[in-house]
Amino acid sequence: MISTCHSWHMFQIRNREMDVFYRGISVLGTCFFLLLAWKMLNWAWIKPKKLEKRLRQLGLKGNSYRLLIGDLGETSQMDKEAKSKPINFTNHIIPRIMPFLHKIIQSHGKNPFIWQGPNPAVIITDPELIKEVLTKNYTYQKPPSDDLGKLISQGVAAYDKDKWAKHRRLLNPAFHIEKLKHMLPAFHLSCSEMLKKWEKLASASAEGSFELDVWPYLQDMTSDVISRTAFGSNLEEGKNIFKLQKEILEHILQILQSFYFPGMLYLPTKRIRRMKKISKEVHSSVLNIIMKRVEAMKAGEPSNDDLLGILLDSNFKEIENDNGNNSNKNCGMSFEEVIEECKLFYFAGQETTAVLLVWTLLLLSKHPEWQMRARDEVLQIFGNSEPDFDALNHLKVITMVINEVLRLYPPGFMMSRVIHEDTKLGSLSLPGGISIFLPTIMLHHDEELWGDDAKEFKPERFSEGISKATKGQFIYFPFSGGPRICIGNNFAMLEAKMALALILQRFTFEISPSYTHAPHTLVTLQPQYGAQLILYKR
């Protein structure tokens, strides 16, 4: 009897313990759910509304926050509508390439705020404030890369603070002007091979003239330049890497033009599986090239004058100078980091120069008087000889033309930064957690800054240099500005000058009747339907 009572008592104790346990689990589950719900509510509504209130108190104007989507719905609709309608061949392109931003500035003034989903972004168009943002790069940082961006490349363009400083320091030798001189033959060879294809088309034409969409040819030429200058003797492997990188970018653009949300890359769709497979192939191919180069350098072979060789040499010297001090984690790059920099060479180097060249050819076609002046300068300096480095840097008319094209059609039409803490910008006390947008093209086209002819193609405005054209104001920054100015800007300018000199030596060109003027924004500012020209062999 006593035993039975004891057993029953123990059963009741265990039952109560289990009851307490399950109640505890239930309470913890409820607390977790409430915490998660609170975080979601704060992210989706409370925090955006608080930030909106702060921004309005600063005198900034913008649309009221819409739950989750913000201004994205209207932006997407206006972009879609704008892209469906080509425009006359004028340089008044802002309403087409960024219609929502154009509308919001007209409605709310030059410094409004917009909503990227639940995240507000303040538009800054004051030159002095933009200068401050680009100069103080430790305060105003690059936005973190999302999953799609990481598939293309990371590299110095994506890093901040000490990591950015280290990579920039190690990359600088590769883009020193003395190193660029050694890359000039690669520029010449790649462009000459493109022009041989054009000459073949001219020979096949009974009239001696032919129509050609020059845009894909320029893309192929600039990718060939990057392959040669980045990997040198590994040219074919480099070209294959570029093809894979280009395919990834095409997939990403298709995703962005349909519907993208964070975490999408975890879905097992056919496209995403293909993207991940390509990314692994690119990683493996670049690593293979790097390891072969490292082994060759260890065996005493020269590092070569290509970008990879110079980067590896710079990296090894930094590690050696550290004298094996393993405590210095900021010394040198890992192989993974070198891979990302090589991927960035492709992505940034090819796009920038290709779009600069295509808009230059189109504008010189529209303005034959400037095409003639540019050609006369090239023939006077080079004749039909191969352009050399020193003379390329003395092409005044060509430089004026390029600067004006970069003003009207900057490859990077918009820049963004984020602030993580409350920050004073001019008279604005901006709250931490917001983005800052710097619309490069809007300053480049601003009639209050450049005059009534701001949207006209007038290279003569740069006849006495950039400083004189801008009257010392910070209103021209096609390659960004401050410490983070594009590290490859001299590379791009030299390549563009070489290509233009060779094209002008061999061809005259005019706009084809089939050309449709439709600038649009992907990663850079591109011609949506190509760039059809009529070319004449000289």
Curated annotation (Swiss-Prot):
Gene Ontology CC: one annotated term: membrane
Glycosylated residues, chain numbering: N88, N137, N325
Membrane topology: Multi-pass membrane protein
Transmembrane feature ranges: 25-45, 344-364
Keywords (A to Z) from UniProt: Glycoprotein, Heme, Iron, Membrane, Metal-binding, Monooxygenase, Oxidoreductase, Transmembrane, Transmembrane helix
Pfam families the record matches: p450
Record-listed heme binding positions: C486
UniProt GO molecular function: heme binding; iron ion binding; monooxygenase activity; oxidoreductase activity, acting on paired donors, with incorporation or reduction of molecular oxygen
Enzyme nomenclature, EC number: 1.14.-.-
UniProt-listed Gene3D superfamilies: Cytochrome P450
Localization per record: Membrane
Family stated for the protein in its record: Belongs to the cytochrome P450 family.
PANTHER family from the UniProt entry: CYTOCHROME P450 72A11-RELATED (PTHR24282:SF255), CYTOCHROME P450 FAMILY MEMBER (PTHR24282)
Name of this chain's protein: Cytochrome P450 72A225
UniProt source species: Catharanthus roseus (Madagascar periwinkle)
